[in-house]
């Protein structure tokens, strides 16, 4: 569940946030994710924000579904991609398709700890055989609210190990760290998990 104050922040700053992140360099990270996908596959952009990655995946020939918990972000993303974007949170999303890949870029970090681990138990069921989940999280931060009222959940090796322990049908295929592309003093963890059976 994404809390109300976090959603309210993105509703109030949707245009500004989307513009700030629209052209952030993500080519390398997206390329790693895409190499695990069937080119005819379907992607779920879970917490799609302003639709930056959703649009690029579409331009690369993929069919993409997107959702976000912020109604204003959904409006911006739909305008940017030309596609409908469903307004819902991680808990209430109901898939109509099976996915080759699930992309959760900088979105799960707004979950509670319980919601974060519940995501993997639930969303792996939306994957087809050998489907993958990509997610990115901030490392080296404490769980809590920032000065803008947004909730953040930090990430560490212990949390990754718990995901794998609770989900033996998910295999870690890649785990790497990257610098912040907005030039903040942050390090991001990037993880790709693959459904084994």
At which residue positions do the language-model features occur?
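Conserved beta-strand signature within the Rossmann-like core of class I S-adenosyl-L-methionine
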Residues: 130-137
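A short acidic, Gly/Pro-enriched loop at the edge of an enzyme's catalytic core
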Residues: 94-102
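Class I SAM-dependent methyltransferase SAM/SAH-binding core
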Residues: 50-92
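A short glycine-rich, Lys/Arg-flanked "PGG" loop and its adjoining helix->strand segment in the class I
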Residues: 117-129
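Conserved S-adenosyl-L-methionine
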Residues: 170-181
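Acceptor-substrate binding/catalytic loop of class I
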Residues: 143-159, 182-184
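Conserved class I S-adenosyl-L-methionine
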Residues: 1-38, 40-49
């Amino acid at each position: 569940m994404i809390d109300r104050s976090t959603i309210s922040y993105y509703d109030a700053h949707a245009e500004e946030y989307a513009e700030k992140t629209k052209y952030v360099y993500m080519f390398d990270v997206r390329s790693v994710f895409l190499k695990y996908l069937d080119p005819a596959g379907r992607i779920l952009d879970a917490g799609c924000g302003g639709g930056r990655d959703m649009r690029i995946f579409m331009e690369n020939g993929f069919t993409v579904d997107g959702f976000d918990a912020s109604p204003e972000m959904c409006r911006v993303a739909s305008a940017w991609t030309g596609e409908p974007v469903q307004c819902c949170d991680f808990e209430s999303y109901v898939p109509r398709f099976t996915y080759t890949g699930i992309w959760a870029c900088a979105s799960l970090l707004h979950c509670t700890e319980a919601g974060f681990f519940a995501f993997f138990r639930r969303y792996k069921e939306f994957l087809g055989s050998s489907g993958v989940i990509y997610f990115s999280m901030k490392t080296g931060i404490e769980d809590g609210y920032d000065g803008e009222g947004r909730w953040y959940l930090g990430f560490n090796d212990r949390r990754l190990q718990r995901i794998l322990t609770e989900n033996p049908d998910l295999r870690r295929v890649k785990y790497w760290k990257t610098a912040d592309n907005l030039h903040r003093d942050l390090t991001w963890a990037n993880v790709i998990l693959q459904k084994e059976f």
